[in-house]
Amino acid sequence: MNLLIALLIKNGQYRTSLHYKATLNSFKRYRDDKDIALCEIDAEEMRSYEAYLHHTAEVCSNTSSFYLRILRATYNKAVAKGLTPQQHPFKEVYTGIAKTRKRAIPTENVSQMKRLDSVKNLTPKEEMARDAFLMSFYLRGISFIDLAHLRKSNLKDGYLHYTRSKTRQRLTIRWEKDMQELMEKYQAQTASSPYLFPFLVDDGNRSQNKTIDKKKEEVRLYHNAEARISYHLRKLGDKIGIKGKLTLYVARHSWATTARGNDISMSVISEALGHHSETTTQIYLNSIKSSEVDDANAQILAVL
């Protein structure tokens, strides 16, 4: 698996390589760093690993499924290369994606977060986490990976244009006053950066190796920022008394819930009545005039 990770890095697939590395590290912890031959990977071994993930590592079913899918992909590559016979070791473990309960907070909580400032004993890192949450909400539930990688060139003539990394769908969002105010707040930090927000600005921990790949460094900065934002959002949620775990994903569902509560048409919302596929959602979104979606977003921001 180390060879596969090295190949992914060589091909510039840094994010994917990190997923494979995380899976390998998890499997090594399960094995106490003991090697295992490909021919020894069978259904019993995978059932045992799945049990370890649930009961010892205490990860959720989607996380265990994520690790098992990566192991399965690695195993199938080895089978395709004739390195081991196919024994179907993953036939008895869960490798699907469980539908998770949609998490949202009331509009009052979003308004409460908007009114918070450093006077309310927010640390600078908590304030940035709060701002990331608000910007995700303002931008119709944009994911952190897309938010962090927004470039100044994505903003043109009063509209933000970007491609959603998960689906490759092209989105256009009218730039509202709330968005502009948050962006201007960080302009000093992004003055020499191509990005709108400072999540990928050098954190001072850059490797001394001058030959390090720029894309690899960007991936490192992104994952550090993601972990930092997640940690301080949880702290912020506890500090202001928000029930449940506060994450950026909550911002996405809170936007949809607020939209539904303001009688905005279901077809306008990306959540789209619990559809099971992105394809169905895209069909709905593609049939709507972008101005209708922009008006809906402006209506939502006005209630804060």
List PLM regions with ranges.
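Short, polar N-cap/turn motifs at the start of nucleic acid-interacting alpha helices
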Residues: S153-Y159, K243-G244, I264-I283
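N-terminal core-binding DNA-recognition domain of tyrosine recombinases/integrases
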Residues: L3-R15, L24-R101, L116-K120
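Basic, Lys/Arg- and aromatic-enriched nucleic-acid-binding interface segment
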Residues: E92-F144
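Active-site/catalytic core of tyrosine-dependent DNA strand-transfer enzymes
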Residues: V110, E176-K243
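Short, basic (Lys/Arg/His-rich) helix/loop patches that form interaction surfaces
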Residues: N121-P124, L221-Y222, S230-E271
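Conserved tyrosine-mediated DNA breakage-rejoining catalytic core shared by Y-recombinases
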Residues: H149-K185, V201-D202
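Catalytic-site neighborhood detector that most strongly recognizes the C-terminal catalytic loop/helix
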Residues: A104, R164-R168, L273-A298
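Short, charged phosphate-coordinating catalytic segments
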Residues: N76-L83, S136-D157
